[in-house]
A protein has these predicted regions:
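Hydrophobic alpha-helical packing segments in soluble, helical-rich domains
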Residues: 26-49
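Charged alpha-helical initiation segments
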Residues: 1-24, 78, 117-124
Length: 124
């Protein structure tokens, strides 16, 4: 799945909550959104610093802030990745993330994907 498709699935889970998935769907949404971040960051880093492709995500996120021409957006993406990573881990003493938090992180990821995804090549 592409990063955009992953975000679409995450948004779909938010929109179609039901009793059967209560308590589980927020972490599923966070996982899908985090996968979208990781795929888009890896793609961006690979285009700008190919030697970093196989490094851990934390290293790629550090490189992202240095390579991006939109440092504020890069910092927001790094924060979103950390928040989404925390949200994917279950701890009995923690509440799942709220819908507004998830939507905010998803919006940040979507903005980043739009900013860094190259335009498709069209044939004439």
């Amino acid at each position: 799945m592409t990063p955009r498709q992953l975000l679409a699935q995450a948004r779909g889970l938010i929109a179609q909550r039901d009793v059967a998935t209560e308590g589980v769907w927020p972490r599923c949404v966070a996982f899908l959104a985090r996968q979208a971040v990781e795929a888009s960051v890896t793609s961006f880093v690979d285009r700008h610093a190919p030697g970093l492709r196989d490094t851990p995500m934390r290293a790629q996120l550090i490189a992202l802030t240095a390579l991006s021409n939109r440092p504020e957006l890069a910092r927001r993406v790094v924060y979103a990745w950390h928040a989404l990573s925390e949200a994917t881990h279950y701890h009995a003493y923690e509440l799942a993330p709220a819908v507004a938090e998830l939507e905010g992180w998803i919006d940040t990821v979507g903005t980043f994907i739009d900013a860094v995804t190259p335009a498709p090549i069209t044939e004439r």
